[in-house]
From Swiss-Prot:
Name of this chain's protein: Dynein light chain Tctex-type protein 2B
Gene name of this polypeptide: DYNLT2B
A GO CC annotation given for this chain: cytoplasmic dynein complex
Disease cited in the entry: Short-rib thoracic dysplasia 17 with or without polydactyly: A form of short-rib thoracic dysplasia, a group of autosomal recessive ciliopathies that are characterized by a constricted thoracic cage, short ribs, shortened tubular bones, and a 'trident' appearance of the acetabular roof. Polydactyly is variably present. Non-skeletal involvement can include cleft lip/palate as well as anomalies of major organs such as the brain, eye, heart, kidneys, liver, pancreas, intestines, and genitalia.
Lineage: Eukaryota, Metazoa, Chordata, Craniata, Vertebrata
Family from the record: Belongs to the dynein light chain Tctex-type family.
UniProt xrefs under Pfam families: Tctex-1
Subcellular location: Dynein axonemal particle
One of the GO BP terms on file: cilium assembly
Function: Acts as one of several non-catalytic accessory components of the cytoplasmic dynein 2 complex (dynein-2 complex), a motor protein complex that drives the movement of cargos along microtubules within cilia and flagella in concert with the intraflagellar transport (IFT) system. Required for proper retrograde ciliary transport.
């Protein structure tokens, strides 16, 4: 009675492509983000929750489809976070999907980062067939 769990990571640097190619170099001496552009866990969690409700509301667990779904979710969430204006943040989105069988799952993450600028949030979605845990990490790019 084996359980299959899909895991996907998606990494982005938080800067829209249009701004990267603007031709003007970005200041590298900025050591702290502007207050309005700091990674805000509560806002990010609301964004993640909305995406999960939309994408997984009627989803059924299928081991063959889960790798593609985890990749799609991680990229979709990463793209939504980029649109939120967290300039100079590298976004890491981790998505874990597993079959809902009434068993428990323990998950943990460890990071080495700057506690003044970097942060994370997570959200859990469950239905009768599956569970999904999403963790989003925002690391300021110096």
């Amino acid at each position: 009675m084996a359980t299959s769990i899909g895991v996907s990571f998606s990494v982005g640097d938080g800067v829209p492509e249009a701004e990267k190619n603007a031709g003007e170099p970005e200041n590298t001496y900025i050591l702290r983000p502007v207050f309005q552009q700091r990674f805000r866990p509560s806002v990010v969690k609301d964004c993640i929750h909305a995406v999960l409700k939309e994408e997984l509301a009627n989803a059924e667990y299928s081991p063959e489809e889960m790798p593609q779904l985890t990749k799609h979710l991680s990229e979709n969430i990463k793209d939504k976070l980029k649109e939120m204006g967290f300039d100079r943040y590298k976004m890491v989105v981790q998505v874990v999907i597993g079959e809902q069988r009434g068993e428990g799952v323990f998950m943990a993450s460890r990071c080495f980062w700057d506690a003044d600028t970097d942060n994370y949030t997570h959200d859990v979605f469950m239905n009768d067939s599956l569970f999904c845990v999403v963790a989003a990490f925002g690391c300021f790019y110096y």
